[in-house]
Amino acid sequence: MVTILDGKAVSEKRLELLKETISESGLYPRLATVIVGSDPASQMYVRMKHRACERVGIGSVGIEIPGDATTQNVLESVTRLNRDTDINGILIQLPLPKRVDTERVIAAVNTEKDVDGFHPTSLGLLMSGRPRFAPCTPKGIMNLLAEYHITVAGARAVVAGRSIDVGRPMAALLTNADATVTICHSRTRDLPAELRQADILVSAVGKAHFITPEMVKPGAVVIDVGINQLNGKLVGDVDFEAVKEVASAITPVPGGVGPMTIATLMENTFAAAAMRMP
């Protein structure tokens, strides 16, 4: 019988543990979120992060910047947050409007406050096997695999998607955990054949029900990072009902990877605060 990897339940457990840890530490970590424009999905995600902060005892401040802002406007806000000694973590809510240079904004974040793990220095440390802050979604996935005692070392892992926020850091974390990793993308030849090699399959392609049973090795662990709309419903990259008949374990959408991402952000923010302890 397939195991449903319940990210919601695992994240609840981790958040409760973090709440206790923060309370016992005597620290008061603070997270600043920066959102540019009024995209409803981005606003919803930011609200969820602030609610999680409140729950575990992390202070939070939201910086809202008009959608017509320039790159320089956003950089000025980031600079102020970098200088604010009361702020431990800075999160830039992505995507930014096209007129804003995302790479410049991310690179402007103080690396000691880069709790999203997207700064070039953070990614470089991750690739070298010495991560300070790993991006929250890939790190959350690794925590979920560990919670269910899924063996990564020696496994053949395939990551579908090569984005800098999920695909590439996911591959790095799996490699650091001694998996044999393949990254697939839009130019991969015979993609189904590559995916069928996976003991652990991570899909981050952003296409509803893209992964079908024919692409999945029987008994594989399937991690669905996708968040897509299909016929008015929220679905993942994986055809869940069909693929669960083939997989040994699978994450649902919603309730799988998403909650783990937020829990990891909270953990990274506390870690950033703890790093500054004398």
UniProtKB/Swiss-Prot annotation:
Chain residues that bind NADP(+): G161, R162, S163, S186, I227
Reaction equations catalysed: (6R)-5,10-methylene-5,6,7,8-tetrahydrofolate + NADP(+) = (6R)-5,10-methenyltetrahydrofolate + NADPH; (6R)-5,10-methenyltetrahydrofolate + H2O = (6R)-10-formyltetrahydrofolate + H(+)
Keyword Oxidoreductase included in the entry's annotation: yes
One of the record's GO cellular component terms: cytosol
Regions that span the bilayer: none
Example GO biological process: tetrahydrofolate interconversion
UniProt KW keywords: Amino-acid biosynthesis, Histidine biosynthesis, Hydrolase, Methionine biosynthesis, Multifunctional enzyme, NADP, One-carbon metabolism, Oxidoreductase, Purine biosynthesis
EC id: 1.5.1.5, 3.5.4.9
InterPro entries: Aminoacid_DH-like_N_sf (IPR046346), NAD(P)-bd_dom_sf (IPR036291), THF_DH/CycHdrlase (IPR000672), THF_DH/CycHdrlase_cat_dom (IPR020630), THF_DH/CycHdrlase_CS (IPR020867), THF_DH/CycHdrlase_NAD-bd_dom (IPR020631)
Pathway where this protein functions: One-carbon metabolism; tetrahydrofolate interconversion
Domain of life: Archaea
GO molecular function, one term: methenyltetrahydrofolate cyclohydrolase activity
Keyword Oxidoreductase assigned: yes
Similarity remark: Belongs to the tetrahydrofolate dehydrogenase/cyclohydrolase family.
Record's function text: Catalyzes the oxidation of 5,10-methylenetetrahydrofolate to 5,10-methenyltetrahydrofolate and then the hydrolysis of 5,10-methenyltetrahydrofolate to 10-formyltetrahydrofolate.
Subunit description: Homodimer.
Protein name: Bifunctional protein FolD
Origin species: Methanoregula boonei (strain DSM 21154 / JCM 14090 / 6A8)
